[in-house]
Amino acid sequence: MAVKMFRDCGSEIFNTGTSKCPFVPDYIKAIILTPVGMTFKISDYDTKLGEYAHADRPNRVYPISTIAEYATSGGEAQTSATGYGSSKITGYSELVETYTMNDYDEGLRTNLMKLKNESMRVIFIDKNNVVYGEKTDTEGDFRGYELGAVYPGGQRFKSSGENASLTINLVYEDVEKAWMNAISFTSDIDILDEAKGLVWVDVKKLATGENKYKVVEHYGGFDLTEMYGTLLGASSVWNNVTAATYNPDDGTLSLTPSSGTPALKRPSELYAEDVKGIEQWS
């Protein structure tokens, strides 16, 4: 381990030129929450994002989309003066960024409440498939900006002038570090198509019909069976099942149990079978 024998000014070494082709960030359309310890390769992040979103915990990322509005507060210089001396910058105030979802979602709001005691990082994707994050000490790697807190907000019910809305508030752990180590790169593919989080689902056995089942959203009960159709009608996506069939006439699944109760496989296994975006409630 190298030890510095002399002190230098470090970050106070700077230049003030501007790019010959200035880059202007565009509208943020998706945010990706990641565990604090996760880093990613810039070279293949876009092609692996879907895999990361379906990975087994604790190596999973949590995409949230679609974002429709953005606002910010804080992140301003704080100053202090001693005696009759001039004011000096002592630091920067807490930065809170607020992202408004295009649509209200009760299930997402509920899940975000569970992050009260969690430490996370965040990566952003804009409308032009530009990815924003933070540099690491390893060339070619990046990670998300570190957050002190993540919490939901917005208007839960419709009023005379506004529809229900959901906001996601991101509180930065260290705004100086985030801004000074920022990095961005552009994907050649439509990475926003992969920026989809998972939805909790329940597997419900119907009272009518032998071994007839439905797959419905845990929050709200929306029936997903017909949407996934034959993808769920394969025994390879199920545990404790010897045979599976999708019935298009009534939008049900016929599952033949082997032992125990039929259950969907882990999201990482479902992803390999092209079943994306769902995880069975547990």
Say what each PLM segment does.
Residues I168:
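Nucleotide and nucleotide-moiety/phosphate-recognizing core
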Residues F40, D105-T110, D126-K135, G220-T225, ...:
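Short, surface-exposed beta-strand/loop "edge" segments at domain boundaries and coil↔beta transitions
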Residues S187-N211:
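Beta-strand-rich domain onsets/edges
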Residues L206-E226:
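Beta-strand-rich structural segments
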Residues M1-Y62:
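Polar/acidic, low-complexity leader/linker segments enriched in S/T/G and N/D
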Residues M227-S282:
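The feature marks long extracellular or luminal low-complexity segments
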Residues I42-A164, E173-D190, T208:
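Extracellular/virion structural assembly segments
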Residues V131-E134, G144, F222-T225, V237-T245:
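Surface-exposed loop/edge segments in extracytoplasmic proteins
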